[in-house]
Amino acid sequence: MKFFNREKEIEEILHIIESEPQRINFIFGSINSGKTALINEIINNRLNKDKYVVFYFDLREIFISKYDDFIEVLFEEYEEPFIDKVKRLFLSLIKDYPDVIKSYALLNITGVVDSIPIPKNTLNELLKKRNVKNVFRYITSVLIKIKREGKQPIIIIDELQKIGDLKLNGFLIYELFNYFVSLTKHKHLCHVFCLSSDSLFIERVYNEAMLEGRCKYILVDDFDRETALKFMDFLAKENNINLTNEDKELIYNYVGGKPIDIIYVINEMKYKKLEDILTSMLKEETQKLKYFLENVKEEDEELYKKVVDALKIFKDSYEIEDIKIPKKLREFLVKKNILFLNPIEGTLKPQSFLVWNAIKRIL
């Protein structure tokens, strides 16, 4: 399927990439709002592969519980050519020697890659010493080599919050943030983009004193009504489906501007009635919310009452000011993916129109 819209966000991100690295860039939004699709469109179709080298680390489907997992995500080992081994051994005997080794693996990095090449023996050393500073030192050396070849390195980490609680002499995430600040604000060496649908993680970052003035936040939200209707027309044409204005309004009233939900509806329309599709989707979301509330009630009657009172606020409004719901309660509802928090704007809303409609139906 062709990529649709997001020209405003694309223009903003390309402007960042074409400028000198200055800040850590956080791309955030509700679940399935199109963050990954956006960044993939940019790195695969909008960048000159001869000018940029993108290291794209997708943590979405990777279980990371220890240091070794983190290292394996970052690096891909290769056998170091014999001549490089000899050079490194010889130069290691010379004090303050310049970095002149140019590995074939490093010189041939181009376009988008999902790991950083590393000699097998170097990787073994990193795993053995378990010192994150050595890891960052090696990455920096790779980035410098790329820069010397006239290319701009870019690091992208999708779902960064997955290492948020990983400890290695303190929380690894803080070591990583310090390193990213060094790469961007201090050395101006590499662009850094972090994607996340975890709005509590973004709130934690936003309130982190060490990152003040060192980050930029880019919201990739669900489509607004006008864009959502155009997206439906786009998909209908792609799939040779006839959509009336009434059909489009009905779809929007059920699923709003959530791209993945609109795509699902249009695909299902190839062999199902629109009303049946939407009724089924809302029924499923309503059942999930009903069982969630049932579980809360069984575990804590008092919490259940507070949750119900909080969700009732959304019967009349899709979006509210965040402080209308007490902090611990809103964090609970955000963690359970019922609500989405935008800490930059200070707003709360259901994760999707489907969730919103389920809230209104149950309460």
UniProtKB/Swiss-Prot annotation:
InterPro entries to which the protein is assigned, alphabetical: ATPase_dom, MJ1010-like_2nd, P-loop_NTPase, WH-like_DNA-bd_sf
Keyword Chaperone in record: no
Keywords, comma-separated and alphabetical: ATP-binding, Nucleotide-binding
Stored Pfam families: ATPase_2, MJ1010-like_2nd
Organism domain of life: Archaea
Any coiled-coil regions, as ranges: none
Binding site for ATP: G29, S30, I31, N32, S33, G34, K35, T36
Annotated GO MF terms: ATP binding
Similarity comment text for this entry: Belongs to the archaeal ATPase family.
Identification of the protein by name: Uncharacterized ATP-binding protein MJ0632
Native species: Methanocaldococcus jannaschii (strain ATCC 43067 / DSM 2661 / JAL-1 / JCM 10045 / NBRC 100440)
